[in-house]
């Protein structure tokens, strides 16, 4: 087995290979992330790891101009104004289906991504107790997370990709 010291250059190399592959495509679909909780939508700041992952996957994050590193509180209307026409919606809370997402707020069906099959959540590997493997294995394998995001936004670049963390909500 490899030590972490020996594995990091390999993982970094694969992440960079994937990110560089996306740079050759001119298409940068728009992306929004997260969902409201308790009436507040905490969007990922434009300098957050999520914003960077979306950019590395060839997406155009709708809040990329924000200078924050963490979550930024917004109301539904301000998010909808910027993200209502986004091509993809990632990580909409704990929902694993579009119907469960609508139970949270029926206005979600106004989002373009909702009506076009563009809602994906990182809930593919959640155990019976709610533990999500993206916060375990995914932190050690950012290249797997990036590959999932590329397969969502640019499926022709990774046509045989099998999702590790993300699933399309139906």
Which sequence ranges carry the predicted segments?
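Flexible, glycine-rich surface segments
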Residues: 13-103
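A structural signal for well-ordered alpha-helical segments within the folded catalytic domains
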Residues: 2, 48-51, 140-147
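Short, small-residue-biased leader/transition segments that mark boundaries at the very start
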Residues: 1-8
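Structured C-terminal subdomain patch of bacterial secreted/periplasmic proteins
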Residues: 91-170
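A hydrophobic alpha-helix/topogenic segment detector
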Residues: 3, 22, 133-135
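Soluble or luminal CAZymes and related metallo-dependent hydrolases
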Residues: 10, 71, 141, 145
């Amino acid at each position: 087995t490899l030590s972490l010291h020996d594995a990091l250059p390999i993982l970094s190399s694969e992440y960079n290979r994937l990110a560089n592959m996306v740079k050759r495509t001119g298409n940068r679909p728009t992306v929004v992330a997260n969902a409201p909780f308790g009436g507040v939508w905490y969007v990922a700041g434009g300098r957050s790891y999520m914003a960077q992952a979306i950019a590395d996957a060839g997406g155009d994050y709708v809040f990329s101009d924000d200078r924050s590193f963490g979550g930024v509180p917004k109301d539904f209307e301000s998010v909808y104004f910027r993200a209502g026409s986004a091509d993809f919606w990632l990580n909409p809370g704990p929902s694993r289906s579009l119907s469960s997402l609508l139970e949270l707020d029926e206005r979600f069906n106004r989002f373009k991504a909702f009506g076009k099959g563009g809602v994906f959540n990182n809930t593919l590997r959640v155990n019976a107790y709610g533990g999500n493997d993206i916060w375990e294995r995914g932190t050690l394998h950012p290249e797997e997370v990036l590959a999932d995001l590329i397969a969502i936004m640019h499926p022709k670049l990774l046509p045989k990709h099998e999702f590790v963390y993300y699933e399309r909500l139906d």
